[in-house]
Structure formats: C-alpha cells, structure tokens
Amino acid sequence: MDNSLSAYTQKYDKEGYGLQCPDGHVIRFYERILKYKLNKTSGKLLDFGCGNGVHSKYFKNITGGGIEPYGIDIVPSLKKVWEKDPCLEAKNFHIISPNSSFKKLFNTQMDFIFANQSLYYLTKQAFKEAIQEFYELCNEGAIIFATMISDKGYSLYERGELMDNGLREVKGCPSGRLDGSSYIRFTKDIEELKEDFKPFKPLFWGDYELINLYNFEGSVEHFIYIGQK
C-alpha cells in the first residue's frame, strides 16, 4: 500500500481518478446477498480504501440511511472531497498512513466491513494485521465483503518476482494505457482466499472480471470473499 501511495495520489490529484458510479459486483452483493439472502440492510459500515466515497454513498442511499458509512484511505487530498460532499459525514472518514493501524480511529463497532479492490496492495504482514483489526472492530454477526486479485490477473503485464513482503511489481501495461508500477499481492485460489480471511467464517465466495479482452490487456480476474464474525 505504501508503494501505491504516490501512484494513487497522482491519479486522484492530476488525472481525475475515481469511480462515479458503484461497481456492478457491489450492487449485486447488496441486492443478492445483503438484501435477499441475509436480510441485513442496516448498521455501521467501514469502507476500507473508500476513495471518493462512491460505494459508501451507494450503501447509505440504497438503504435510506439504514447503513451508516465510515471510511479509510491513504490519499491526503480525498479529505477535501469528503468535506465537500453533502452525502458524507466527513468526520467519519479518515486518512491513514500506508500499512498503519486503524483500530483506534473509531469509537464504535462495525456491522459491515467493505474492502473493494484495496486489500491486495497491502504487504502480507500488513494484510494479516488488517484482518485481525477488522475482526476486533466488528460486532458479532458482522459481514465482511472483500475482493482480491487472482493469480490470473495482469498475466499479460510484466510481473516481477515474489518479494519477501508478499508483493509483486506489476508494470508494462501491454496497451500502453497505463504508466508506472503497482505492487500487488496475488491470491492463488479459493482455498487460499478462505485461509487468508480467518478468523472470519466464509459464507459466500466467487469471482468476477472487470473486463477480459484477450488481445488487449488480458484478464483482471478478482476473487470475492463474503464472510461473517
């Protein structure tokens, strides 16, 4: 995550980065799992790697305020974005240093942990510590939703050797669309996914592709983990 700070600061500050609408797999998570299967549509939600807050606002709005969002990110300029957004309570959103503890930022327990496309930038040790902090922050019965990049992801890019911290350098976008490097922790399979999120109990798991154009940039397959305390 520290390796990604400069890259994402550049994207947000200079390139207008940030979703304007919620991801399709997030909408399906709410409609199919939270609303239909679990009937769990109220409580406090921690959005880890919340960016401009688009998913936090989605959960708040779709539930008529039943879900109260809190957020964490590492890009300093996002603080001003949250403060200007009338749909967000800026006091509930925090900037943290990469790979740092966050458990003392909140004086409340969470009913949902939401980590969409953010946890795989953490080193192996920081990831392990984050999962434990999530668990300690959660009320009994809380739901965690998280996504991780599968080993198929970015296979057409240049992927460096596995480093001691569990990350690989990813660079050389085959289409030339992206510059620079990212440092990513890849997940081999569903069994590794389930193991990584212990002590949460797995409820549902699967995968999705953002887009897979075989002759352009290839697969960006992600795994989905939905678990419970």
Which positions does each model-derived feature cover?
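A short glycine-rich, Lys/Arg-flanked "PGG" loop and its adjoining helix->strand segment in the class I
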Residues: 128-140
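Short catalytic micro-motifs in class I SAM-dependent methyltransferases
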Residues: 117-118
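Class I (Rossmann-like) S-adenosyl-L-methionine-dependent methyltransferase catalytic domain
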Residues: 1-43, 51-103, 145-229
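A conserved beta-strand element that flanks and buttresses the S-adenosyl-L-methionine
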Residues: 114
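Conserved beta-strand/loop positions that form the S-adenosyl-L-methionine
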Residues: 48
